[in-house]
UniProtKB/Swiss-Prot annotation:
Assembly description: Heterodimer of a B chain and an A chain linked by two disulfide bonds.
GO cellular component: extracellular space
One Gene Ontology molecular-function label: hormone activity
Cited Pfam families: Insulin
Top-level lineage group: Eukaryota
Primary location recorded for the protein, binned into one broad class: secreted
Subcellular location(s) of the protein: Secreted
Protein known as: Insulin
Gene that encodes the chain: INS
Species: Acomys cahirinus (Cairo spiny mouse)
SS bonds (residue pairs): 7-37, 19-50, 36-41
Keyword Metal-binding annotated: no
Similarity remark: Belongs to the insulin family.
Functional note: Insulin decreases blood glucose concentration. It increases cell permeability to monosaccharides, amino acids and fatty acids. It accelerates glycolysis, the pentose phosphate cycle, and glycogen synthesis in liver.
Signal sequence, renumbered to the chain: none
Length: 51
C-alpha cells in the first residue's frame, strides 16, 4: 500500500481492504475526505476509521 489520494469508491474499497471484518466508520464529516482525497493518506491513517 502506497500513500495515495483516495476519493469516492476508491476510498470505500481501501477501507474495506484495510478494515476487513471489523468494518469502518464513514461519514463525510469525519475528515477522511480531507485526509485522503484532498491530501494523501497512509494505511495507518485509514486504520483510524476502522471500528
Amino acid at each position: 500500500f502506497v500513500b495515495q489520494h483516495l476519493c469516492g469508491s476508491h476510498l470505500v474499497e481501501a477501507l474495506y481492504l484495510v478494515c476487513g471484518e471489523r468494518g469502518f466508520f464513514y461519514t463525510p464529516k469525519s475528515g477522511i475526505v480531507d485526509q485522503c482525497c484532498t491530501s494523501i493518506c497512509s494505511l495507518y491513517q485509514l486504520e483510524n476509521y476502522c471500528n
